[in-house]
A protein has these predicted regions:
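An amphipathic, basic-hydrophobic helix/alpha-beta surface used to engage anionic
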Residues: 1-239
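Exposed, interaction-prone extracellular/peripheral surfaces
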Residues: 157, 161-343
Length: 343
């Protein structure tokens, strides 16, 4: 007996197929064969006739296997919630022809399935992404390295006179300027807050924050920007807080999405202000920090400013659109731009 999925992963809300494969290699038929397994209730069967749902989904399917027969049954499922899901074993029950004797066997399975964070539409992600790119471009302009030559282009009125290449201008008959690479690396560190669980509003805000992190990171990696992701959320596989290290190239986007799929939001996580203070000693001044956090009660802003040491940063703030104004964050910062995201 083998249980598998026809895809390794789907995005939240998408569909896949769970495939049950039964092989009877014996020279005797099996008139009744019951195959049972359990998995997370957040992977939903379209046909719930043979399923019992409580804290888990318990599935029981009945087969009749002829002599040396292979049976394949496909069951459509939908990923209802982001997560990393496993099926560890199946229980197989068979009976004799008279239905008087029962045999039970257990088959280990190594079935893994990822439901990745939900996609966010381009129209919604465009504003925060353009703000990130704008900060990266402005930082490059401020910190051009005169020793890192990157080519020649036409003169613009905003260019300093010291950048004019007089020899090239004389040959071309028009003013040309030298281009320089930046002393700052094009690197963004995404700080993701996963604190809280239990209420529909809290869960929705956390899931939105995780989806924003995934979407922004994928776009930045595709544009050649290095990305690191750090979160107080706990990896359900190794039990540690997420810290990806530096990722480069569009091919690492799927790896990051898988890591985010495994994040567990809890009430007992390290508070974001404390995590920011912990990160301060190892901070890289050249990185652009992007905080994604719904936190509006604890004093996050001073610790974020201390982490960036006065450099520009962005705080994407998912918030409940029904939240009363008196509970909303009113603090402002010269160096941290707060981008509100209604959910």
């Amino acid at each position: 007996v083998q249980i598998s999925f026809d895809r390794d992963y789907i995005f939240c809300g998408e569909e896949a197929n769970l495939v049950e494969t039964i092989v009877n290699n014996k020279y005797l038929p099996l008139p009744v064969l019951e195959v049972g397994f359990d998995m997370s209730r957040w992977v939903v069967f379209q046909d719930e006739e043979n399923s019992t749902v409580s804290d888990m989904t318990y599935r029981r399917d009945v087969f009749t296997a002829s002599v040396r027969q292979r049976i394949t049954r496909t069951l459509p499922v939908r990923g209802k919630k982001r997560g990393y899901y496993r099926i560890a074993s199946t229980t197989v029950t068979s009976y004799d022809f008279l239905m008087t004797e029962k045999q039970v066997a257990h088959f280990p399975q190594e079935t893994e399935f990822y439901v990745l964070p939900a996609h966010i539409s381009a129209s919604h992600i465009r504003i925060p992404y353009s703000k990130i790119m704008g900060l990266l471009v402005s930082r490059r302009r401020v910190y051009d390295d005169p020793f890192e030559f990157a080519g020649i282009r036409d003169y613009r009125r905003s260019d300093p006179m010291k950048y004019i290449n007089w020899k090239a201008s004389a040959r071309g008959g028009t003013l040309l300027v030298n281009q320089h690479d930046s002393t700052l690396s094009q690197k963004v560190t995404v700080l993701l807050d996963c604190t809280g669980i239990g209420s529909a509003v809290t869960d929705a805000l956390n899931e939105t924050a995780i989806s924003i992190a995934a979407e922004l990171a994928e776009r930045m990696l595709a544009d050649g920007i290095s990305v690191s992701a750090i979160s107080n959320g706990i990896d359900t596989v190794d039990g540690k807080m997420l810290s990806t290290g530096e990722l480069t190239g569009r091919n690492t986007a799927l790896y990051l999405r898988r890591q985010l799929a495994r994040l567990e939001c809890r009430n007992d996580l390290t508070p974001m202000p404390q995590l920011l203070r912990t990160l301060h000693d190892g901070a890289h001044g050249s990185d652009l920090y992007v905080l994604i956090s719904k936190e509006q009660k604890l004093p996050v802003l001073p610790d974020l400013e201390a982490l960036t040491e006065g450099s520009d940063a962005i705080w994407i703030l998912p918030e409940d659109r029904n939240m009363p104004e008196r509970y909303k964050l009113t603090e402002t910062s010269k160096s941290v731009e707060i981008v509100r995201w209604e959910v």
